[in-house]
Every structure is written in structure tokens, then in C-alpha cells.
A protein has these predicted regions:
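Short phosphate-coordinating micro-motif centered on Lys-Gly-acidic
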Residues: 24
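Hydrophobic transmembrane alpha-helices and their helix-loop junctions in integral membrane proteins
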Residues: 4-19, 28-310
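Cytoplasmic/organellar membrane-interface segments at the starts of transmembrane helices
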Residues: 250-252, 305-400
Length: 400
């Protein structure tokens, strides 16, 4: 309850002090969740998690005080209407970026991730990947871009480089794993790399894709971790080798797994495709070479999700003949997520309608405060146009 309340506080705070207090309050229940109910190496994982996140966010209090001294207020909306010197923006943005990059996490601040995700109980892994990872991305959108726009533009190449490294490195690490929890953990590194990349493209396709990808990644990754938990109750193992040949004996379970795995590598028609497609379009709009470098990350996702799926479905079965298929409680848990995977993949207009007004305001305000011309096609703010483009129809905008 404390953890969920603090998470809600972070995403709803309009005051820097409250934002900071809720941000720090999340650490204690998360540490206890890992250290008390985690796996065999839970103490090491919990300590590593709290040391990394404390090191990343300790200086955030300095930023909070600095904005109060310079801007005369803790109110985020009031500070957004003020202009700060470039030097002030740069050092405050660097501190904020460090805290947010650790929380996402971005390469090279990701080394706490496999230990925390791997040792946390399934409920903890779901919260870490589906919700807490989004705090860093939200921090960039709520504080980084509005309060320090010129610094955000100045450091954008560095953040983009870190994001691309996260996408490619996370994909390679996920492909090399034999543990299902670690595969999903490293896949989150790659997916969140796409999110941060989309934010720092500074075009509407990129930012739209980033926000909708945050929603979709939470659904898909949460579902995959839930299925790993169901699997562990039956086999007692998180290893691929301990869960082979399930397709014949638990077909309903593997049907759900296949759907969420395909969503995990952004197969067209699933929810993750929408955000990833928009981010790739935004990347090619920003720079053709940037788009070309990012594309292999999407291909890696297919490789690391299809490999375990193939082995778990058609491999040589072990003790799966004794298993029962899904219970009523498990159906009730997974059906809503399966519905969202398909609905948001086939009809993304629901999310686009909700987010477009805020994103339009964010991008236009950012453009007006940065002394460069950013490409914004106002037709692209129509969720109908974007939804049609995803279905292959002509939009008349800049999308192919």
C-alpha cells in the first residue's frame, strides 16, 4: 500500500518538494519487498538496488532547493513559466538526468537491474518493470524538458547515445540469457531505451511513441512476469531448460505466452508495435543514420523472445505431463492484459486521444523556449491520422 501510494504521488505531484519526498519514499518499501521476500541472493540485490538509486537521487534535493532560490517557488507549473540561465539549466539538468537514468535504467547505470528483477518476488518484479521504471521517463517529461529546455537540447545527443546503447546492449544481453526473469529484465532495458530515445527526439512522433510505449511496456512486461510466476509454481524453475515442451500439455498457457512474447518484440497488431513504430518514424525524421542504428534493436527483440518461446513450446518435455492447464484465477489475471495487448495494438486511438493535448502543449512550449527550429506537423496531433497511418492508410502528414 505504501509503495503504490508513493508511486501515485510521484505521478501526480505538482510541487518539487512533494515530488522529491514521494520519489525517495519508494525506496524503503521496495528494499523491504526484495530483501524479505526475494530469492536466495535477495540481500545483495536489495542492497545494490538501494545504493544505486540513493546515489542517483541524493543530489535531487539540491536541485529542488536551487529552483526555489532561483525561481522563488516549489510549484512546477509556476517554474515552467520562468526562464533560467543556461549554466543553471545545465548543472540542474545533469543532476536530474543522473537520477532519472538510474531509475529507468539507462546504460551504463543498469547494473542493478538484473539482480533486483531476478531476485525480487514476482509481484516486486512486476512493480519494478511495469511502473517504477517509468518514473525516470516521467521525470524527464515532467521536470527535465519543461524546466531546463535548453540544457535538454544541449545534452540530447548524449542521452540519445545512452538510449541506443541500452537498446542494443539490452537486446544482446537478453539473447544470451537462459533464465526467463533475466530475459524479461534485460528486455526492459532495451524497451526503456526506446522510450528515452523517443522523448529526446523532440518531435511529435517520438514523444507520442515514448508515452504510449510506457503504457504498453507496463502491460506486456507485467503479463510476462506474471506468466513466469505461474510457470515457477508448476516447475520450480525460471530456467528455459526446466520448462520445455509445454505446448502439448498446457496449450492455453502457451497461447497466452505466445501472445505476450509477440507483443514483447512489437509484432504488428500488438500494443508494443504502436509505440515502437512511432519512435522509429521519429528517429528517421531526426536523422536517417540514427534510425538505421536503432532498427537492429527491434530485430534483436524478436530473436530473444522467439528463442525461449520455441523451446518452451516444442522442446523435449520434462515433467509437463503432470501439469494442469490454467486455473480460473490465472485466466482472470491474464485475460484483461491479453485484451489490452490486442485492443491497444489494433485501436491505439484510445491512448492517442488522451495524450495528444498534453504532448502538443509540451512540444510547442519546448520549441518556443529553445533557439532552434524543431519540425512539428500539426496534422500529426490528430489521433485519427496516427491510427490510420499505423493501419497503412495515407495521413497527409510526415508519416510514411
Amino acid at each position: 500500500f505504501v509503495l503504490i501510494s508513493a508511486l501515485i504521488g510521484v505521478f501526480s505531484a505538482l510541487d518539487l518538494v512533494l515530488f522529491y519526498l514521494f520519489w525517495e519514499a519508494i525506496l524503503i518499501p521496495t528494499y523491504l519487498l526484495i530483501s524479505l521476500w526475494g530469492g536466495p541472493q535477495r540481500d545483495h540485490a536489495a542492497l545494490k538496488f538501494i545504493l544505486y538509486t540513493l546515489a542517483g537521487s541524493a543530489l535531487l534535493l539540491v536541485v529542488v532547493i536551487a529552483f526555489r532560490v532561483e525561481g522563488g517557488s516549489f510549484s512546477i507549473p509556476a517554474l515552467m513559466n520562468q526562464s533560467f540561465s543556461v549554466n543553471f539549466q545545465q548543472w540542474t539538468f545533469l543532476i536530474m538526468a543522473l537520477a532519472f537514468a538510474v531509475k529507468v535504467p539507462l546504460f551504463p547505470f543498469h547494473t542493478w537491474l538484473p539482480a533486483a528483477y531476478g531476485q525480487a518476488p514476482i509481484a516486486g518484479s512486476i512493480i519494478l518493470s511495469a511502473v517504477m521504471a517509468k518514473m525516470g521517463a516521467y521525470g524527464f517529461l515532467r521536470l527535465g524538458l519543461p524546466l531546463a529546455p535548453e540544457a535538454a537540447h544541449f545534452f540530447a545527443p548524449l542521452i540519445i547515445a545512452m538510449s541506443v546503447c541500452s537498446i542494443l546492449y539490452g537486446g544482446l544481453l537478453a539473447f544470451a540469457q537462459s533464465n526467463l526473469k533475466k530475459i524479461i529484465a534485460y528486455s526492459s532495458l532495451g524497451h526503456m531505451g526506446f522510450v528515452i530515445l523517443g522523448i529526446f527526439l523532440f518531435n511529435i512522433n517520438g514523444v507520442q511513441g515514448a508515452v504510449i510505449q510506457m503504457v504498453n511496456h507496463g502491460i506486456t512486461t507485467g503479463a510476462l512476469f506474471a506468466m513466469v510466476g505461474i510457470l515457477y509454481q508448476r516447475s520450480g524453475s525460471h530456467e528455459i531448460s526446466g520448462n520445455l515442451g509445454l505446448g502439448k500439455f498446457v496449450p492455453a498457457f502457451m497461447g497466452f505466452w505466445g501472445l505476450f512474447a509477440f507483443a514483447g518484440f512489437a509484432f504488428p497488431g500488438t500494443n508494443n508495435f504502436v509505440g515502437e513504430f512511432l519512435i522509429l518514424v521519429g528517429a528517421f525524421e531526426r536523422n536517417l543514420w540514427l534510425g538505421a542504428v536503432v532498427v537492429p534493436g527491434a530485430l534483436l527483440a524478436a530473436a530473444y523472445m522467439l528463442r525461449p518461446t520455441q523451446k518452451m513450446t516444442w522442446g523435449e518435455p520434462s515433467n509437463a505431463t503432470k501439469w494442469r492447464d490454467m486455473s480460473g484465477r490465472e485466466w482472470a489475471c491474464l485475460l484483461p492484459m491479453a485484451f489490452l495487448v490486442l485492443y491497444l495494438g489494433l485501436a491505439p486511438t484510445l491512448c492517442l486521444k488522451v495524450m495528444n493535448p498534453s504532448l502538443k502543449h509540451l512540444i510547442v512550449a519546448f520549441q518556443s523556449r529553445v533557439s532552434v527550429t524543431l519540425s512539428i506537423d500539426k496534422n500529426l496531433f490528430s489521433p485519427v491520422n496516427n491510427a490510420e497511418s499505423l493501419n497503412g492508410k495515407s495521413t497527409g502528414g510526415s508519416q510514411p
